[in-house]
Amino acid sequence: MPPNNSKYVLDPVSIKSVCGGEESYIRCVEYGKKKAHYSNLNLLAKAILAGMFVGLCAHASGIAGGLFYYHKLREIVGASMSVFVYGFTFPIAFMCIICTGSDLFTGNTLAVTMALYEKKVKLLDYLRVMTISLFGNYVGAVSFAFFVSYLSGAFTNVHAVEKNHFFQFLNDIAEKKVHHTFVECVSLAVGCNIFVCLAVYFVLTLKDGAGYVFSVFFAVYAFAIAGYEHIIANIYTLNIALMVNTKITVYQAYIKNLLPTLLGNYIAGAIVLGLPLYFIYKEHYYNFERSKRDNNDAQMKSLSIELRN
């Protein structure tokens, strides 16, 4: 427990390029608290934009991976090259989300939940933010799947083996996702959102652009190449797979994958990461709040949240 006379000054002009653990936690809580003040329309617009970015880069990743899924090339380099290229392309989505200040449900499971733990967000506001965020992400991802991926014919089954590698790559990914058991899917979703929430935490911890890119890229690359399950990415992938008539059903997509993935992602952010961080740093946040009151809110004027929304 920190001493009672601890003072916390969050200085955006500091020469430090990395925040300490206490400051990172405070920034994360303040970031989550800020979301509760947005209007429903603002939240929805940000969430739709984030869902669209996930769809944009999932489409690009599918095309990139599909290029190496060409049957003759696959015989030489193996299917693992497609997975490597897929994982290497997908992190661009999270860089787009960070740079535009859009709103991703999976990151909110950590930041907004910690603000709830600190009683800086009311339960009804918490439910409002999380619901609108998830709904907006869904609308953005599915809209992109239909208006770009489906209407462009990028993943259409052309019934010619030498031209069908994009469809086959998508089909194989979708089939693998819907054939996990419930427990397997939840576990893979927990692993995924640990990386995603850490990517958010990295951005709040680091104070330079190169650090953002480097840390976010490898955090997201790790979950993408490991085959973890991300609810918004899966919403795009499984819906475009349904649109182009792959070998999966609506029941498999929504009940066997999306439902347990949603549960696992939430557990990772709210419980696996959120609770330990809260118990470790709650006294530091209490002292920060007390310092803010003692100094007539002077400390808050210097608070800089790098992940702007």
Curated annotation (Swiss-Prot):
Provide the Gene Ontology terms for cellular component: plasma membrane; vacuolar membrane
A single GO molecular-function term is:
high-affinity secondary active nitrite transmembrane transporter activity
Biological process annotations from GO: lactate transmembrane transport; nitrite transport
Q: Which residues lie on this side of the membrane: Extracellular?
A: 69-79, 151-163, 180-181, 227-249
UniProt intramembrane stretches: 20-35, 164-179
The record's statement on gene disruption is: Conditional knockdown results in the failure of parasites to progress through the asexual stages. No significant effects on gametocyte development.
Q: Which residues cross the membrane?
A: 41-68, 80-100, 123-150, 182-206, 210-226, 250-280
The reported effect of V196L is:
Results in delayed growth of yeast cells when transporter expressed in the strain lacking endogenous monocarboxylate transporters
**Keyword Acyltransferase in annotation:** no
| Stated consequence of mutating G21E | Does not affect growth rates of yeast cells when transporter expressed in the strain lacking endogenous monocarboxylate transporters
Catalyses which reaction(s): (S)-lactate(in) + H(+)(in) = (S)-lactate(out) + H(+)(out); formate(in) + H(+)(in) = formate(out) + H(+)(out); pyruvate(out) + H(+)(out) = pyruvate(in) + H(+)(in); acetate(out) + H(+)(out) = acetate(in) + H(+)(in)
Q: Among its keywords, does the record have Cell membrane?
A: yes
Write out the annotated subcellular location. Answer: Cell membrane; Vacuole membrane
Description of how activity is regulated: Inhibited by diethylpyrocarbonate (DEPC). Protonophores, such as 2,4-dinitrophenol and carbonylcyanide-3-chlorophenylhydrazone, abolish transport. Inhibited by phloretin, furosemide, alpha-cyano-4-hydroxy-cinnamate and alpha-fluorocinnamate. Inhibited by the Malaria Box compound MMV007839 and its derivatives BH296 and BH267.meta. Inhibited by the Malaria Box compound MMV000972. Inhibited by broad-specificity anion transport inhibitor NPPB.
Topology class, membrane? Multi-pass membrane protein
With respect to pH, the record says: Optimum pH is 3.9.
Q: Write the record's keywords in alphabetical order, separated by commas.
A: Cell membrane, Membrane, Transmembrane, Transmembrane helix, Transport, Vacuole
| Further remarks about this protein from its record | The expression levels parallel that of the L-lactate dehydrogenase and the glycolytic enzymes. In contrast to human monocarboxylate transporters, is not sensitive to p-chloromercuribenzene sulfonate (pCMBS). BH267.meta inhibitor attacks parasites at the trophozoite stage. Inhibition of the protein leads to a build-up of lactate and swelling of the parasite and infected erythrocyte.
Question: What family is it from?
Answer: Belongs to the FNT transporter (TC 1.A.16) family.
Q: What does this protein do?
A: Monocarboxylate-proton symporter that mediates the efflux of the waste product lactate in the intraerythrocytic parasites; active in acidic-to-neutral pH range. Transports L-lactate. Transports D-lactate, pyruvate, acetate and formate. Essential for asexual growth but dispensable for the development of gametocytes.
Q: What is this protein called?
A: Formate-nitrite transporter
Q: Which organism is it from?
A: Plasmodium falciparum (isolate 3D7)
| Lineage of the species this protein comes from | Eukaryota, Sar, Alveolata, Apicomplexa, Aconoidasida
